Swiss-Prot record:
It is a single-pass type I membrane protein. It comes from Candida glabrata (strain ATCC 2001 / BCRC 20586 / JCM 3761 / NBRC 0622 / NRRL Y-65 / CBS 138). Residues 1-18 form the signal peptide. The chain crosses the membrane at residues 496-516. Its main location: membrane. The lineage of its organism: Eukaryota, Fungi, Dikarya, Ascomycota, Saccharomycotina. Belongs to the MTC6 family. InterPro entries: Telomere_Capping_Maintenance. Residues 19-495 are extracellular. It is found in: Membrane. It holds the Pfam family TIM-barrel_MTC6. GO terms for biological process: cellular response to hydrostatic pressure. This is Maintenance of telomere capping protein 6. May be involved in telomere capping. It comes from the Eukaryota.
Amino acid sequence: MYWLLFLFFVHFLRHGLCDTSTRSNGSGTMNPAGINITNSTYMNATWQSNSLSHELAVRSQRDIMSNITIDQVPFPGINLNSVLFHKAFIVNNNGSHLPFNESIAFEYFQNIMVYGAQSFVVDIEVGMNYSWVLKETDVLLSDLLIQMRNFISATNNNLYGNVLMLLLRVDPTIKLASARNKTIYNSRLNFTDDLFNKFPNLNITGILDNTIGRSFIYTPSDFLGTYDPPYSIDNSTNFWPTLGALMYGRRKRLLAMEITNSFDALESNYIFTNHNLTYDVGNVSISCPYNRDQFISASETTFKFLEARYTKSEVEMYSGCGYSPMIANRFDSANITALIDLLAPAVVWSWAVGQPILTVSVPRKTSDLVAENCAAFNFAYNNFSANWFVENCYSKKRALCRSDKQIFNWTATNVKDSYFEMDGYRGETKCPNTYSFSIPRTPLEQRSILLQFEASQFNDDTLWIDLNSISVSNCWVSGGSYASCPYQRAVSTRNFVAMMVPVTVCSFVLLMMALYFSLFRIPIYDNRYNWRRVVNNYSKTEVDGVPS
């Protein structure tokens, strides 16, 4: 009986208070289910699993961009041929090169996706067996896509899901070996239905179908078939869906685009042509926006990528200019972990390093009001930078406000107050007329704030922004102090008491009944010997046999 009561309480506490699908890797960090990102070492390179703060930062950025059209969402990524899939990638402890091992490269590829890289440019060519392979390797494109499918399947939930970009750079030249003299002849293929029928391994549509799966791919026919309403706050005049509509409405996880111009849309109806993106390579003249008109113009350009060999400061700068950096630096198995530091400013463009800090319990003896559940925008004038930090919601600060008419116009409130007084929930807002309490939702918007504050000689300050984890700790949402967490059910103190009272009363009654039956036994059960004697005496009076 006591064990039943105990199990009942455990079941209630586990399933009645929290509704979450997170899974722990056993080391205190939350990782996508099914993806092995435990610390792995190979040739002096150790890849550390993500910290919980990093995962919260990436998730909060994704969520605040849910109303941004996908062509304006940053997709930081890498050139797979330069970073992983090249003949000099595998080295031993002495620095000597070893034969290429694609299983090791695939392991790091999974780790890079888990860290937060979202776009991958792949140089492909036709191999000797008329199959698509990564250029200058024997790695099949289909094997690479299977790795992407495994990641998509393992992260196909609201906690870890995100959209990936596959960018194909196609070399249409095929190298044919003569059987007689082993001479290599070059021939340029014309991709037609007849060629695909003769060599099905060259049919990109079929490869994507058999690896990723049609249900996960957002195709040109999806784009042309139905238009999602432009719920975004940017000035884009196109009809690309918002990130939220693509992920949660259509449940799509991959866009495939071609950088070159080898495929006709009719032969590959799963791939967007290069007319849908801006892809620059190397030391090109890149202009960053500096005024409102330039910011608006930048926001009207779809899918801007810049592939180059970067430094960390350049990754941060070009991210702020509205580009998705495509890192083409050469790495090997000994220094591949340095890619994390290079990707970091693009993967987490908002929060400071180590932020958001995890919410901890507040000592009960304190007399001050403390709630470390609100985000603040920390502007530094001298080094032209800004990062987000977790602050006490009851602290008095000014707030960041966005113009209701011009999305790249910003200001700050004149008065300082707690976070709870800034969102206008009580009918009053501290922001000026035609301005609203807001938050920068892309690196481009964050850069517009920096330039505007710099031009107005705005002093170093920390401003409230529309982001908090008030409803559920460590679940960061925008929409004011009463915004709810989509991943957990929040239970207030009042509701918790209301839920616990009937359970406690019922449990107390059951406990009293158990005590009663254990202390005051039934008389017949307690006097078993006397009862057995009465039965035996009665049996003696009965007549044996059949009466005559």
